[in-house]
């Protein structure tokens, strides 16, 4: 079945779930065991389901052309105030309960050799370092240090200080130290690690699955796609100004050189769509990695050879007696 048809089928199933949830008594709440220790009433359940419908409407797209074909009017309708979540939809992590801890968070937030990719941090750079890194032959790339007014990346004290969300590893004397291993090359080397949630976030406390920030920025994208940039501006500025301490964007974009953030890969100032994507990646860095991969493929930004979609699991294929296949590399279904 074509993936677009499957996405539409999934949306219809979720819409049926919304209709059924609305028939429940107003005092209905989900059992605490369903979403570990979360009190979710009927109306909140509907808002969560609406969020998943929005995801289904948007994230199926594999290409820029398909992303443009999304029903953005319906996205606007579903992301209107009152229709989507107003607090994080999360799961309480508990090492004694299977399925509540996050191995992905553990591996991406490790304070030893887990790092934030340079392509995540790089667009914040105003020094030109990131553009020089992009122009460096792939095998010769290594870590870089950016300079940025975005206080989520580094502090006001300069590029060696920690930001609100990212920091640089140091030894007991406070000296920067690189602990990534060279066995796989230095291409993936980065100075930056996530510090927003601490080292035990993957197994302690609330692990967000969906955020109001995601819904607000999808709404901003809908406004941009429908030719209403003025309506997108305040949604982009919510986190940009409050958390990044960056100047607000306007309908004309992110400002002018040399201080604009984010920048495009060629070093020019980003437009509103760039600013929206940048906010989404920085703010939701630890929420559902599939979101960022889906965004990047639909904007044509995946690195060459990356898989564009997931194959059917090998075990399923074996049960069905079908040949094993995959995507990525030079296979069909790979990013050009």
Predicted regions and their residues:
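Acidic/polar-rich alpha-helix caps and helix-coil junctions
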Residues: 1-115, 152-153, 157-336
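C-terminal amphipathic alpha-helical segment
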Residues: 118-163
